Swiss-Prot record:
Function, in words: Nucleotidase that shows phosphatase activity on nucleoside 5'-monophosphates.
Cofactor: a divalent metal cation
Assigned keywords, A-Z: Cytoplasm, Hydrolase, Metal-binding, Nucleotide-binding
Record's protein name: 5'-nucleotidase SurE
Similarity remark: Belongs to the SurE nucleotidase family.
GO molecular function, one term: nucleotide binding
Enzyme category, top tier: hydrolase
Cofactor binding description: Binds 1 divalent metal cation per subunit.
GO cellular component, one term: cytoplasm
Taxonomy, superkingdom: Bacteria
Pfam families reported for this sequence: SurE (PF01975)
Amino acid sequence: MRIVLTNDDGIEAPGLLAARRALEEVGEVITVAPDRNRSGVGRSITFGAELYVEERRMADGGVGYACSGTPVDCVRLVALGMVEGFRPDIVVSGINHGENLGDDITYSGTVAGALEAIVIGVPGIAVSLSTGRPWHGADGREELHFEPVARFTARLAGLALRDLPPGRILNVNAPNLPEEELEGARVTRLGRRFYQDELIEVRDKNGRVGYNIYNNPPGHHDEEGTDFAALQSRRISVTPVHLDLTDTAGLKELESWDIGRLVVR
């Protein structure tokens, strides 16, 4: 199994290293990740500029590649032949430092990296660990348990390669617990967030007005069967996700609007 591994926290993130160690037990892994933190970039790509890649020695002595672009760029580079003779069978993105649940997944560079697997025609898995703070804001006081979900992902990758239908990825989220405290895993649907941000005006030293808008943690609706509910019950959540955003249930209703009459000849 040939695995391309990426993330959005950057090449030096500890979750990336934990994922690589586990995945190397089940396949050949090429690690290509952003050269800096790219959290929240979604499916953005690099237009009108070159992508630069440099070999980087990782904390365990292994070799990875640091890319100047986004997680999507990283996956596309490997798919197009950046590493001679290597064509990925599956994409794994993560392990993200912080959960990617519910409505938040459309913001996520981690999930976007896995979604690019659909574009290149292979299965994909996005993996995140629910932590108190994102990696770039961590203060080192929170104990992090990447290894349980890393091992789970390595086992899941084999199943996904064999059985996951085309056009679909798996979004995996794990509570930050040691393996013996996990209550298993559950197949879930995406939950629903509600956001509590405020508009706060600030001024820099030159008097220029700016705004702080992402300042309060989001909440979520308590609903059974969701990814949120799984984590609250100390379980790993696995949610199937596809790239086609068409609201098929809304097609018939929209057809009743007779929008053709809006075109004036």
